[in-house]
Amino acid sequence: MSQTWLIVIDPQTIFASPTSPWGSPAFPTIIDPIDRMVAAFHGRTIVTRWIPTATRCGSWCDYFDRWTFADRPANDPIFDLVDEAQPWAERP
């Protein structure tokens, strides 16, 4: 397992908030299990963050037409990692 890395995909407000159309009501239940996995991987964790593209061309045009609430600047707080995920992204 020393060469194995944990990847935590998009633990962001946009997917966690109950007020977000993409929010999952089960999101709070993943925090403790991920905390335990992050500890077990001893610094070998990568955390991703979804942000909208700068240009809305190609397939993204239809996507943002459908999900207009997500058509925001990439620095909008809705795309921030949830507070609990901040330590997962820290580098020693």
Residue spans for each PLM region:
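Active-site acidic carboxylates
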Residues: 1-91
